[in-house]
Amino acid sequence: MGTIHLFRKPQRSFFGKLLREFRLVAADRRSWKILLFGVINLICTGFLLMWCSSTNSIALTAYTYLTIFDLFSLMTCLISYWVTLRKPSPVYSFGFERLEVLAVFASTVLAQLGALFILKESAERFLEQPEIHTGRLLVGTFVALCFNLFTMLSIRNKPFAYVSEAASTSWLQEHVADLSRSLCGIIPGLSSIFLPRMNPFVLIDLAGAFALCITYMLIEINNYFAVDTASAIAIALMTFGTMYPMSVYSGKVLLQTTPPHVIGQLDKLIREVSTLDGVLEVRNEHFWTLGFGSLAGSVHVRIRRDANEQMVLAHVTNRLYTLVSTLTVQIFKDDWIRPALLSGPVAANVLNFSDHHVIPMPLLKGTDDLNPVTSTPAKPSSPPPEFSFNTPGKNVNPVILLNTQTRPYGFGLNHGHTPYSSMLNQGLGVPGIGATQGLRTGFTNIPSRYGTNNRIGQPRP
């Protein structure tokens, strides 16, 4: 029978756990500003959706989706604060840094799905273009632009700031960079403003507002309603082109890949580690991106028998810690030994050692012989670690197998196979190599019976 718990602790539901973590984040003063912007975002998004319905403008709807993306970015910022408050647990030993990577990936993918929805609706509108009312179009444009810029420039969103710098440039950034170089060639004083890489979120907000302003002007002047659909397609393409590089970068981080720009540096560090005093080999190295700007890795280092494990571990960690923040180093000594000979009494039914194969098995070392820091056998008589993990039969005593195979009669040979040690000690029948030139093997060096056969009692002719 199991243990009876009189006062069992009630299990929290998913929403209960979520509410508890939200209270943990809300207790931090740094999150109050984010929560305030989140409330304002919900209010602005509600008004913009009503104005989209009244104006019947799909271009304004596409621009409103950028405001919804700002709400996702604020949620990502809250998750980033929550990650800094939580410590690694036994279940999540590397911490919760990958959660903010997942939040960035989900936000960018949802923005791209919204852009695809706008493209689908725009394709339907090309067949039957409805009438656009410009009453709230310009007002909604400036409200969305001001709020988007104010949110992006006021809130320090570390995950999106890192991704926007680390990811490849979008086609919109490349075209704007070309225009900026041409403009700075005419007016050199603008180089400090336009030549640096522009924020992709600010750039798409400005470009979308510019497209809506052109839409408003053309509809007011010529009642050209098709320009609203064209502007919606342009905003959707700019949104997709801006979010795609970020989703690719965050997806690669989730797949635990190694960043291309650090592969050369890691190779250089591995070569430096392999030249350290006492290090014989560095193998099974694996490095991956744990979070934004943090690498994790594991490496196996084989050292000499007389090398100091703690010194080698300190030097290896010191070399790799410049790039790899979370590092696991497994050190084992180059300790190949000969198995011990059979010891103890032999059973009475064993006729002769030479008619049997003796397979000595190494004994399992106790836990007291292990180094608690590196999990490396401390004594030089221990087997190599790669042959010590989950090896069956380590606690089995030496096994003696009876050799019952016989050879045909009439050739003057023994009935049993010639022992491996006897063959080597006899020089494999090569003239000039006597019995004194035996080789060391992992089997017993029993004196050979060349020319005798005790089993049938007949001398060799």
Swiss-Prot record:
One of its GO terms (molecular function) is antiporter activity. It is found in: Golgi apparatus, trans-Golgi network membrane. Residues 1-33, 86-98, 156-200, 245-461 are cytoplasmic. SUPFAM superfamilies: Cation efflux protein transmembrane domain-like (SSF161111). Keywords: Antiport, Golgi apparatus, Ion transport, Membrane, Transmembrane, Transmembrane helix, Transport, Zinc, Zinc transport. Expressed in brain; especially in cerebellum, hippocampus, parahippocampal gyrus, superior and middle temporal gyrus. Also expressed in B-cells, colon, eye, and lung. Lower expression was present in bone, brain, cervix, ear, heart, kidney, muscle, nerve, pancreas, prostate, skin, stomach, and testis. Its main location: Golgi. GO terms for biological process: regulation of zinc ion transport; zinc ion import into Golgi lumen; zinc ion transport. It is a multi-pass membrane protein. It comes from the Eukaryota. InterPro entries: Cation_efflux, Cation_efflux_TMD_sf, CDF_SLC30A. Residues 55-64, 120-134, 222-223 are extracellular. The keyword Ubl conjugation does not apply. GO terms for cellular component: Golgi apparatus; trans-Golgi network membrane. The chain crosses the membrane at residues 34-54, 65-85, 99-119, 135-155, 201-221, 224-244. Residues 371-392 are annotated as: Disordered. NCBIfam families: CDF. Heterodimer with SLC30A5; form a functional zinc ion transmembrane transporter. PANTHER family: ZINC TRANSPORTER 6. Has probably no intrinsic transporter activity but together with SLC30A5 forms a functional zinc ion:proton antiporter heterodimer, mediating zinc entry into the lumen of organelles along the secretory pathway. As part of that zinc ion:proton antiporter, contributes to zinc ion homeostasis within the early secretory pathway and regulates the activation and folding of enzymes like alkaline phosphatases and enzymes involved in phosphatidylinositol glycan anchor biosynthesis. This is Zinc transporter 6. The gene is SLC30A6.
